[in-house]
C-alpha cells in the first residue's frame, strides 16, 4: 500500500452512498409490512437493519475487488481505495468476508431464515453473477442483473413478516424498472470510459441515440408501474399524487435527454433518478402513516 490505511478507506470500499439509498428502500419495506400506523419492533428492526446493511456493504466491497482492473481505467473510479493502493486485495477480501459472515449469522438467527436466504441470493447475484459475468458479457447486464439490486424492500418486508407478500414484490418491480434509466443515463455520460474498459454497456454496443430512446421507454414503463401501489389498494392519495408529480418530472428529464444533445442532461437525469427513488419511497411511508383516501377527501369537503 502506498499510503497508510485509514478507516475511511474501508468505508469507501463499501460504497456508502449506494448502500444508504438501498437501505432507505429496505427500511421502507419493513415499515410498509406493518399494519397501518404500526411500528416495527426494535428487536426485529435493529438486527434486520444491521444485518442487511452489512450484506450490502459486503457485496459492494466484493464488487470493487472484482472490478479493480476496470476501476483503474475509468476516471469515475480511479480513486477507489484498491486502485489507489490504500488497501491490499487481501485486506479487502478479509473485510468483505467478515461483513458477509456477520450479516448471514445475524439475519438467520436474529431475524428469520427466509430473509437470510433471500439476502444471500441478492448478495451472490450482485457480487458474483452481475459483477463477474453479466457486466462483462451483455449490454442488458443491468436489466438481467437488476433483480439482485431491486430486492432490498422485499428483504425488509420479510424481516418483519417472514413472508414474501405480493406488495413487497411490487416494490421490487418498481426498483427493477427504475434501474435501467438510472444506470443508462450515467452510461451515456461515461460512454467512452466504458468503451476503454471494454464493458459492453448499452451506449457502447448500441450507440447513444438508442440508449436515449431506451431511457425514455423505461421511464414511461416506470411511470405506469408506480401507479400500481394505488391501483392495488396498497397506498392512497398522498402516494398517488407524489408518484404522479415525481414521475412527470422524471419523464421531463427523459424526454429532454431523448431529443436534446446537451451534454449536461445525462448526469442531470442520473442525479434526478436518485432523488426520485428516495422521494418515492418516502411518499410510500408518509402515505402508510397518514392515509388520505377518496372517502376522507369527500368527507372533508362535506360531500
From Swiss-Prot:
It is found in: Cell inner membrane. Pathway: Porphyrin-containing compound metabolism; heme O biosynthesis; heme O from protoheme: step 1/1. It catalyses: heme b + (2E,6E)-farnesyl diphosphate + H2O = Fe(II)-heme o + diphosphate. InterPro entries: Protohaem_IX_farnesylTrfase (IPR006369), UbiA_prenyltransferase (IPR000537), UbiA_prenylTrfase_CS (IPR030470), UbiA_sf (IPR044878). The keyword Transmembrane helix applies. One of its GO terms (molecular function) is protoheme IX farnesyltransferase activity. GO terms for biological process: heme O biosynthetic process. GO terms for cellular component: plasma membrane. The chain crosses the membrane at residues 17-37, 42-62, 91-111, 114-134, 142-162, 168-188, 208-228, 231-251, 270-290. Its EC number is 2.5.1.141. PROSITE patterns: UBIA (PS00943). HAMAP family: CyoE_CtaB. Converts heme B (protoheme IX) to heme O by substitution of the vinyl group on carbon 2 of heme B porphyrin ring with a hydroxyethyl farnesyl side group. This is Protoheme IX farnesyltransferase. It comes from Alcanivorax borkumensis (strain ATCC 700651 / DSM 11573 / NCIMB 13689 / SK2).
Amino acid at each position: 500500500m502506498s499510503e497508510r490505511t485509514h478507516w475511511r478507506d474501508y468505508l469507501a470500499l463499501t460504497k456508502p452512498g449506494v448502500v444508504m439509498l438501498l437501505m432507505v428502500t429496505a427500511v421502507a419495506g419493513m415499515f410498509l409490512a406493518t399494519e397501518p400506523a404500526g411500528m416495527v419492533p426494535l428487536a426485529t428492526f435493529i438486527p434486520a437493519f444491521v444485518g442487511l446493511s452489512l450484506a450490502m456493504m459486503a457485496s459492494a466491497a466484493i464488487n470493487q475487488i472484482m472490478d479493480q482492473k476496470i476501476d483503474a481505467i475509468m476516471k469515475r473510479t480511479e480513486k477507489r481505495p484498491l486502485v489507489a493502493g490504500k488497501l491490499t486485495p487481501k485486506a479487502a477480501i478479509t473485510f468483505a468476508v467478515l461483513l458477509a459472515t456477520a450479516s448471514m449469522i445475524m439475519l438467520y438467527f436474529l431475524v428469520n431464515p427466509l430473509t437470510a436466504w433471500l439476502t444471500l441470493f441478492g448478495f451472490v447475484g450482485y457480487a458474483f453473477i452481475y459483477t463477474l459475468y453479466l457486466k462483462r458479457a451483455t449490454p442488458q447486464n443491468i436489466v438481467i442483473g437488476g433483480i439482485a439490486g431491486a430486492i432490498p424492500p422485499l428483504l425488509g418486508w420479510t424481516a418483519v413478516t417472514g413472508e414474501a407478500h405480493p406488495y413487497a414484490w411490487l416494490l421490487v418491480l418498481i426498483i427493477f424498472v427504475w434501474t435501467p434509466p438510472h444506470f443508462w443515463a450515467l452510461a451515456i455520460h461515461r460512454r467512452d470510459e466504458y468503451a476503454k474498459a471494454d464493458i459492453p454497456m448499452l451506449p457502447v454496443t448500441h450507440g447513444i441515440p438508442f440508449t436515449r430512446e431506451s431511457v425514455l421507454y423505461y421511464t414511461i414503463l416506470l411511470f405506469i408501474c408506480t401507479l400500481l401501489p394505488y391501483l392495488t389498494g396498497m397506498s392512497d392519495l398522498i402516494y398517488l399524487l407524489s408518484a404522479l408529480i415525481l414521475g412527470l418530472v422524471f419523464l421531463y428529464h427523459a424526454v429532454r435527454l431523448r431529443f436534446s444533445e446537451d451534454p449536461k442532461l445525462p448526469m442531470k437525469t442520473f442525479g434526478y433518478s436518485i432523488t426520485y427513488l428516495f422521494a418515492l419511497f418516502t411518499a410510500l411511508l408518509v402515505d402508510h402513516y397518514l392515509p388520505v383516501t377518496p372517502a376522507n377527501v369527500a368527507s372533508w369537503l362535506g360531500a
